[in-house]
């Protein structure tokens, strides 16, 4: 499985907003209505294509509970992208975004791409946070925004892929130092500058001298 | 330092006292001195004392030293001393002064560790020292953290986890260019990650897999030293029981990166020397690492995914070649077999590959056969035999095709007298005198038919030729005979397990079993016997289980032992209580629980072998049903007597009976619906059986068609091998040739020079030769001149007397001579020009070799000059000759003028010539 780039993501946000379900929907294309509480972090991976290039996403799904905060903080530094998730049916999860963002900005590298996600868009009837509010928050803090539903899979692909596109663009713009793996980006094995075999330009003409 | 010197000179008991005093005074100096130098000296002295007076230094200096760490961190030296002091008082490692430190009890270091980590800030302080690059700070910090982790692992893990970037900082140590720090960091990370899934995940997130695998590779993989061992231990720490990390490991393509480490170079010299102990350890750990990824205890999808990758990247192939390689130590081989087992277990693709592996023997045999040969061989190490059985089981696990292939080798149709088959080996093992072989073979056979009714029926067809003259006996009957003959515990348990597995879910086998009337009485006698130890109890329990199975899967074809008959016998002869008791003893046995834990046979001693994992599963699933079959619906027995009755009694009875009738009707309805569904399922099952049979036939046909192909391909392989061999030989030859050629090339230049020298020498000699020739030519010319002079004088002298003809003749002769000389000269000239050309050529060669060039050119130029002068001389000579010619012409004309006949005598001519010459002179 060769790839051009490898991006490391983390998923953060309050407990119960659907982080693990988003990951499961993205990696396994299925929805699990009753999901165990995440303990610490769980890992998932998938290959996507951007601009005709294979990109491997390695995703660490973190526990939302406060007690795991110290553990999840360790993952900020090495991540290239973060999905910050709240639940549109629970206002408090939206209110906590500022804390999450501060935490993320403090511990991550400054170039980390953050995607704000309002999850559970299928539960329109129980909506407590308007889409406009999410958009406004994202605009204010320079984030990308999207509403998703891990249950119906609406926008789930897009959320992960758009984040990757943003990172990819930053690489093209030279913002990321791609040789520093601590940024959560790695160049694929076959794309690293390999030593090309040089063609030696002919051995000097050794003819002549036999003209008599 | 004075104090210190005093201490060293003091006797033992005084030493302790004065030691404490010294420590006290040093502590005071550290805390009160305002000068950094003084403090540093005092801390250095404390460090020196800290090994010998751990208790004193630990109790008195801890806070003071912590203070130093906090406030003197600009001075690397004092920090280093303080950290070393901490290390000494925390470390429980035995030192040179072991007797002294032991006085304080065993876990002094642990107690100090507790005090130290009571304030979590102390640990953060230590972690912050890791930012310091100075070796005197970083190294002792790593050592101190390691010893703290060793002493109080759980507590410290929690503290480090909470410190921001704590784990990340420790991970960064792996990139330290100083090897000693990197290596100690490996030990530190090993302690840090032990049993803590969250830290394991963070460490993995920090690219641990990549970095560790890089270190392993840089250190020479399995040929590397203890650092490789530490790396492999760390990898295992990170992966064991950590599904998330395992998934990451697989997704990060790290399995592929492990692959090169498994390539064993089959060098002849390594065969003689053997494997170093370190290499054996490294290989062992590497294999265990693979097993961690495909362990049957992992989540199944995880294991399946890893198995697939291992096949695709060629890791399984490498493992199989280690299996078949020579010179591999027995314990590595055993672990390799275990590893192969778990890589193929339950994975159809990998099992198929394994079945195709051939051992490099003559003729090539399937690896499975070669392995089974070891299994039934008493001389092989016990653990190796266990591993082979595990491998065989894993090969057959969820592998109906494999099962049928094995059973096929037992059937008479497929019998091939020449080659050894798995079936022959299993039968041999089953009836060998070695109880362990009996056990291994029966369990192996059990796995060939487990959960596979078709193969159970096929196995019934197996007939054995016992001895000459007597009729063949079926395998089933032979097993029963052996069982009834007694024998060792493992033999009987093995036989009972295969019989239980065989008869379960297979009514035909049950009826075969019951047809021999000796079997049931034997079982009854075993179960009803009350004597015996723990082991006999197992046998009795298994006999009860077998009896239960005979009831459970009884199709009532045997009249003597129909379901009801059996029940009757059991209840009368054994009793329900006793039967239940015997049956339950099986599961209560310690070896049963041990075997039920995991499929891997992790026995250390042959005596530990009792139960098989697969059998425990069978037992678990059928135990209750057997009990139900034996005890349930036992209420059929009607023991009531009808006594003197009243109307009420009759009414009651009637009501009871009516109720019963109702119940029975319901029961009948239930049973009818059951029967209908059962019929349906029977039809379906029959269809399935038919399908399976068809498939089987198809497979057989395929197999038949495949086998010639495979023989052809083996021929092809042989010829290819031969070709490869010859090519290799050619390669070798050409190699030798190229070597000699290159040698020649090396010597080429000096040779060329010498060749040139020789040519020059030759040229020189040639030139000398030509010089000589020219000289001789010149002398000849002189002579000719003289002769001419003589002639002219003669001519002039005898101008009147000598006849012209003579003169003419002489002239002709001289002309001829001259012609000869000119020819010779021309010839020489030609040679000279040729040599000139040669010289030019050589000049080209000379130019290429700059060393020799100057001399050669100079010489050559000299030669040229010489030659030029010679040419000039020759030219002169030519001119002279021309002059002579002219003169001769003149003489001729003169002679003619004189009227003398040219045809005169030579003498006259001479005289005339002399005369002429004289005349000329006179002119």
UniProtKB/Swiss-Prot annotation, chain A:
It is found in: Endoplasmic reticulum-Golgi intermediate compartment membrane; Endoplasmic reticulum membrane; Golgi apparatus membrane. Keywords: Endoplasmic reticulum, ER-Golgi transport, Golgi apparatus, GTP-binding, Lipoprotein, Membrane, Nucleotide-binding, Prenylation, Protein transport, Transport. One of its GO terms (cellular component) is endoplasmic reticulum membrane. SUPFAM superfamilies: P-loop containing nucleoside triphosphate hydrolases. GTP binds at residues 13-21, 61-65, 119-122, 149-151. InterPro entries: P-loop_NTPase, Rab_GTPases_membrane_traffic, Small_GTP-bd, Small_GTPase. Residues 188-212 are annotated as: Disordered. GO terms for biological process: protein transport; vesicle-mediated transport. A motif (Effector region) lies at residues 35-43. Its main location: endoplasmic reticulum. SMART domains: RAB, RAN, RAS, RHO. A lipid is attached at residues 211-212 (S-geranylgeranyl cysteine). It is a lipid-anchor. It comes from the Eukaryota. Residues 201-212 have a biased composition (Gly residues). Coiled coil: none annotated. GO terms for molecular function: GTP binding; GTPase activity. Required for protein transport from the endoplasmic reticulum to the Golgi complex. Belongs to the small GTPase superfamily. Rab family. This is Ras-related protein Rab-2. It comes from Lymnaea stagnalis.
């Amino acid at each position: 499985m060769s790839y051009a780039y490898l991006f490391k993501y983390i998923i953060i946000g309050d407990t119960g907003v659907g982080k693990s379900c988003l990951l499961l929907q993205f990696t396994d294309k299925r929805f699990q209505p009753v999901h165990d509480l995440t303990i610490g972090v769980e890992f998932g991976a998938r290959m996507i294509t951007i601009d005709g290039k294979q990109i491997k996403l390695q995703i660490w799904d973190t526990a939302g509970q406060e007690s795991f905060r110290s553990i999840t903080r360790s993952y900020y530094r090495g991540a290239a992208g973060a999905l910050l998730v709240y639940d549109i049916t629970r206002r408090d999860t939206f209110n906590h975004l500022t804390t999450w963002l501060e935490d993320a900005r403090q511990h991550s590298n400054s170039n980390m791409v953050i995607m704000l996600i309002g999850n559970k868009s299928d539960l329109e009837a129980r909506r407590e946070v308007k889409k406009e509010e999410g958009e406004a928050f994202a605009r204010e803090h320079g984030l990308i925004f999207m509403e998703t539903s891990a249950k119906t899979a609406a926008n789930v692909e897009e959320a992960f892929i758009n984040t990757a596109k943003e990172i990819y663009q930053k690489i093209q713009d030279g913002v990321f130092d791609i040789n520093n793996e601590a940024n959560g980006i790695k160049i694929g094995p076959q794309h690293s500058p390999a030593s090309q075999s040089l063609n030696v330009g002919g051995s000097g003409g050794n003819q002549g001298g036999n003209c008599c | 330092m004075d104090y210190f010197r005093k201490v060293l000179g003091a006797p033992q008991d005084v030493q302790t006292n004065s030691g404490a005093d010294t420590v006290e005074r040093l502590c005071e100096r550290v805390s009160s001195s305002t000068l950094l130098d003084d403090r540093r000296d005092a801390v250095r002295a404390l460090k020196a004392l800290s090994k010998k007076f751990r208790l004193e230094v630990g109790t008195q200096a801890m806070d003071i030293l912590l203070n130093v760490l906090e406030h003197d961190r600009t001075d690397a030296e004092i920090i280093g001393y303080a950290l070393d002091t901490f290390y000494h008082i925390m470390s429980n490692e035995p030192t040179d002064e072991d007797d002294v430190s032991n006085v304080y009890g065993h876990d002094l270091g642990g107690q100090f560790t507790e005090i130290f980590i009571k304030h979590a800030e102390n640990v953060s302080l230590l972690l912050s020292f890791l930012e310091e690059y100075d070796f005197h700070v970083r190294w002792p910090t790593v050592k101190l953290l390691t010893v703290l982790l060793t002493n109080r692992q759980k507590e410290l893990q929690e503290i480090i986890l909470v410190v921001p970037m704590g784990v990340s900082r420790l991970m960064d140590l792996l990139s330290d260019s100083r090897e000693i720090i990197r290596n100690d960091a490996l030990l530190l990370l090993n302690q840090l990650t032990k049993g803590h899934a969250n830290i394991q995940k963070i460490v993995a997130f920090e690219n641990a897999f990549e970095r560790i695998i890089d270190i392993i590779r840089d250190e020479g993989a399995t040929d590397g030293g203890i650092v490789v061992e530490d790396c492999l231990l760390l990898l295992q720490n990170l992966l064991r029981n950590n599904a998330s990390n395992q998934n990451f490991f697989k997704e990060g393509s790290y399995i592929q990166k492990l692959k090169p480490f498994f390539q064993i170079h089959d060098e002849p010299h390594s065969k003689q020397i053997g494997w170093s102990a370190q290499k054996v350890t490294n290989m062992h750990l590497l294999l265990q690492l693979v097993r961690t990824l495909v362990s049957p205890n992992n989540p199944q999808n995880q294991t399946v995914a890893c198995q697939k990758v291992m096949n695709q990247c060629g890791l399984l192939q490498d493992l199989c070649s280690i299996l078949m390689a020579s010179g591999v130590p027995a314990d590595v081989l055993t672990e390799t077999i275990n590893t192969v087992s778990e890589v193929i277990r339950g994975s159809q693709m990998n099992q198929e590959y394994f079945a195709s592996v051939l051992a490099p023997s003559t003729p090539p045999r399937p690896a499975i056969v070669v392995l089974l040969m070891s299994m039934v061989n008493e001389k092989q190490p016990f653990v190796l035999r266990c591993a082979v059985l595990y491998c065989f089981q894993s090969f057959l696990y969820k592998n109906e095709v494999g099962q049928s292939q094995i059973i096929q080798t037992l059937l008479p149709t497929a019998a091939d007298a020449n080659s050894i088959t798995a079936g022959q080996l299993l039968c041999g093992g089953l009836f060998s005198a070695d109880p362990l072989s009996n056990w291994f073979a029966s369990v192996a056979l059990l796995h060939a038919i487990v959960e596979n009714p078709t193969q159970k029926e096929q196995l019934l067809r197996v007939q054995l030729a016992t001895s000459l003259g007597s009729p063949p006996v079926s395998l089933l009957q032979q097993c029963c005979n052996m069982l009834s003959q007694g024998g060792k515990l493992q033999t009987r348990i093995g036989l009972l397990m295969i019989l239980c597995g065989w008869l379960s879910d297979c009514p035909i086998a049950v009826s075969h079993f019951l047809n021999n009337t000796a079997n049931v009485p034997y079982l009854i006698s075993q179960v009803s016997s009350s004597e015996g130890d723990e082991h006999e109890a197992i046998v009795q329990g298994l006999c009860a289980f077998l009896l239960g199975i005979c009831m459970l899967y009884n199709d009532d074809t045997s009249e003597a032992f129909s379901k009801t008959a059996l029940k009757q016998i059991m209840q009368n002869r054994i009793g329900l209580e006793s039967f239940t008791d015997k049956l339950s003893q099986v599961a209560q046995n310690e070896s049963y629980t041990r075997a039920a834990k995991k499929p891997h046979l992790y026995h250390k001693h042959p005596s530990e072998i009792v139960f098989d994992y697969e059998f425990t599963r069978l037992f678990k699933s059928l135990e209750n049903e057997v009990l139900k079959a034996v005890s349930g619906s036992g209420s059929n027995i009607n023991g009531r007597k009808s006594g003197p009755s009243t109307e009420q009694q009759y009414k009651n009875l009637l009501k009871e009976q009516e109720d019963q009738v109702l119940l029975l009707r319901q029961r009948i309805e239930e049973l009818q619906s059951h029967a209908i569904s059962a019929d349906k399922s029977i039809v379906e099952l029959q269809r399935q059986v038919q399908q399976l049979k068809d498939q089987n036939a198809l497979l057989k046909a395929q197999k038949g068609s495949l086998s010639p192909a495979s023989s052809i391909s083996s021929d092809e392989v042989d010829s290819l091998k031969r070709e490869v061999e010859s090519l290799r030989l050619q390669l070798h030859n050409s190699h030798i040739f190229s070597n000699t050629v290159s040698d020649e090339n090396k010597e080429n230049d000096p040779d060329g020079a010498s060749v040139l020298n020789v040519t020059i020498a030759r040229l020189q000699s040639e030139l000398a030769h030509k010089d000589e020739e020219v000289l001789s030519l010149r002398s000849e010319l002189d002579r000719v001149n003289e002769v001419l002079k003589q002639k002219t004088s003669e001519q002039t002298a005898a101008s009147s007397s000598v006849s012209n003809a003579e003169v003419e003749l002489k002239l002709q002769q001289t002309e001829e001579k001259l012609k000869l000389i000119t020819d010779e000269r021309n010839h020489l000239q030609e040679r000279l020009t040729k040599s000139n050309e040669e010289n030019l050529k050589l000049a080209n060669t000379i130019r290429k070799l700059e060393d020799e060039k100057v001399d050669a050119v100079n010489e050559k130029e000299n030669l040229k000059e010489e030659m030029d002068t010679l040419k000039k001389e020759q030219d002169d000579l030519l001119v002279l000759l021309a002059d002579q010619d002219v003169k001769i012409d003149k003489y001729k004309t003169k002679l003619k003028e004189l009227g003398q006949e040219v045809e005169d005598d030579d003498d006259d001519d001479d005289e005339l010539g002399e005369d002429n010459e004289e005349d000329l002179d006179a002119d």
